[in-house]
C-alpha cells in the first residue's frame, strides 16, 4: 500500500459514530434519553393526537423516506423535493486515480447568494429569516442563522439549522459522494479552493464544535476525520482538534496509527538523509520510537497527545515520548508545570 492509501484508510468513517444521539445512548442509556426528550417536550409527544399528526407529516414529507449519512431529517423541515435547492455536484478525475467532488451553483442560486449578501450587510436577523422563507434550503442563510442561534445560546436551534444545511448539500451531491462517505478507502475529496465547497467545510467544522460542547467526543472525532479527509492539506487546521478529541474519546490506538500514517504520507516524496545523527534530540526520538519527521515538530498538542496516548496504551516508550515533547516545546512544558503546581 502507498502512504496515501494507508492514511485514507485511517480516515474511513463509521456511520454509527456520526450521530451524537448514539453516543448519548451509550453514555446514559436509551431510557434516560427518552425521559429527557419527554421533559423538554412538556409531555406532548406522548399524546396519541400529536403522534398521529407527526406520523402523517412524516408520510407526506419525502425527506423522511431518504437514507442519509450526515444527519437525520425531521418531519418539520420543508419538503426538499418541493422546494428550490439550486445546487448540483460534479466529479473530476485527478492524476493517480483520485476523484475530487465539487458543488456547483445554478444561476438562480447565485442570485439567492446576492440577496443573502444584502441581508448580511443590513445587520438585521429578520432579513435572513425572510430570505429563508423564500429559499428554505439556501445553505449560507442556514449557516448564518445557525451562528445567530449559537450566539444567543440556543444550541438546539443552531444544530437544527446546521443539519438542514448538511441535508441540502448531501441531497444535492452525486450518489458516488454519498456512498463514498462510509467507504473503506476514506471519504471523497473536495477542492477547498472552490468557493462553492466552503459552505460544507464551515457546516462540518461548526458541527464539530457543537458536538464538543455537548461532550460527545467520539462523534466530534468522527466528523474531524471527515473534514480532514476532504482535503489533507488541512485548510481548516483540523489537526488542532484531533489531538484533543482522540484523547478525550479514548481512541488511543487509532491516534498513534494516524500520526504514523500522516507523517509517512507527508514525507513520502522526501529523501531521508542516510548519514546517522548522534544529537541528543535524535537519541530521544529513538528511545520514544518516534519515526516522525515533521508532524509533531510544529504542533504542541500532537506531541504531548502522542506521549499521553502511549501512556494510555501502557507502552514502555511513553516516558521517552514525554521527554521528547518537552524538548520540542519547552515553553509549553513550563505552562503545564505551572498549571499542575509542579
Each model region followed by its residue ranges:
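Alpha-helical repeat scaffolds
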Residues: 162-163, 218-225, 251-266, 287, ...
